[in-house]
Amino acid sequence: EFMVLARFLDQAGRDKSAPLAGPSTLSQLSGFFGYNNFLPNDAPNGNAEQPAAPVTLPISQILGLPNDLRGGVTGPCPYLPVKPELLKRWQDALSEFSKPWIGIAWNEAQPGLTLDTLLPAIRSLPGTLVSTVWDHSRRQLSGHQGIIDAGAHIKRLDDLAALLHALDFVVGPDGIILHGAGAAGTPGLVIAQYMSPWYWYAETDRSLWYPSMDVLKAPR
């Protein structure tokens, strides 16, 4: 959800010193976007530290407005921060492999989308498959040849952001990788649940919030 919100923060008329409140798990991500005044609302007495807020409207409720009232989404995109030196490092590292460079992501276990479930649908694609997974889910790569294990070199969000900017396409389930690809303006396909969250709302299969992303919903 924060990755969607980050697209519009600069348009709120406040500088990056403005406080942001939310779960403590988002503190690193908010800092990545340059908002370092983060107030965790799930910490002891966390709510007491938060400034009084005016009338609020959750972004998800915007989708309930009529189209002519809601209007279009006009926030800037791409907006995922990237360090040029890291982007060049990924581009140089991948340059020996055929394009397009297709980033892939998967879930840790079923009933999520595992690598074994995803691969039959993408093996015939041209170019090079590049794993973007950096946690223990990388173990699913064992026994699969021909996939570049870029995740082994991802140590922080800066590395992931630069990789997502370097790739030509990204495919996988709902998660930070697909949100990041959308924020980077990288074309991609998210494989979402049939009753997908509001942030994967799509009109004619194209994501409302991430213009470069298509949304494929699982059957009922």
Identify the residue ranges that each predicted region occupies.
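Catalytic machinery of carbohydrate-active enzymes
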Residues: 1-220
